[in-house]
């Protein structure tokens, strides 16, 4: 299915289904300007995605000899079909950090390194084995490194009469990058900003500050003038400034909830902490989560624990700061609420803490992208 979203440059959306995935579909964008074409993201490397992508490209009569591919980030639902385009002569553009991370992961087994971190934090080995069999990100991602031209923050891609500026927005992945057409106030936000669901912010191997990076990247986008936002998944509606505020509040709530959980269970592993906080799972208990759901929840919990540890709200009983959080020695009157509001003030989140009440915390939900 192809839908035209904008004229001059002509912008189309191809709905790429993601079967058996709560994300439902990927928004693949196709820009056409003065005889040149840019494809943004591809979908998983599986038959249903390939069929939808190439049916859409055929409908738009895309000439691969005058086409480029831009990947907003390394996740398989955005990069999986890259090799299907490179074999047709389409050059690939991608942020240097994510490209290098992807190549290293393919060469050295990045999944295994994350498994060791998760195992050390209480994730059961048998659930990791089950997760490996059903993790679509593993099964349908690129299996081999592909050639790419790497970009950095503020690099400009030229497409016919259009200029697209690369905006590095780390957090969802270390090298996540949005594209911005300034004169049209158009932002292709990838998975950095979604409207119907909340991007998953997880820990990454050798990336110490994924949540801090994400919160900073939200404010970076907030400084741009944006009238049209085209996200990587689901629909787009409402004001991007309001959505940025809502996403910031969501993580404020998650941090407060995790700090409360650690206050009450200071010797718990991150896996145990993840099981004590609220997730959007249609009322199911933690024990009923699938291994994949637990994997994403664990990663997000660790990212928030790392933020709290870096800010001094919690300390670790082992050298690795992701491991075994315990509350620091603080006066009895210093509750988790007071400590957290002090952290918000010192971390430029005071504006949000003033607007947020305890009753709001229980209403926050997370879906994974």
Identify the role of each PLM range.
Residues 37, 44-46, 137-142, 146, ...:
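Metallo-beta-lactamase
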Residues 45-49, 56-157, 238:
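Active-site HxH/HxHxD metal-binding segment of metal-dependent hydrolases
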Residues 4-64, 178-190, 195:
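Conserved beta-strand hairpin/beta-sheet module of binuclear metal-dependent hydrolase folds
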Residues 250-266:
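Positively charged, polyanion-binding regions of nucleic-acid-associated proteins
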Residues 261-369:
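C-terminal regulatory/interaction regions
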Residues 21-23, 149-151, 170-173:
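A short catalytic or substrate-binding loop motif that flags glycine-/basic-rich loops and adjacent residues
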Residues 72-78, 95, 172, 176, ...:
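Histidine-centered divalent metal-coordination motifs
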Residues 233, 258, 308:
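Residue-level signal for inorganic ion chemistry
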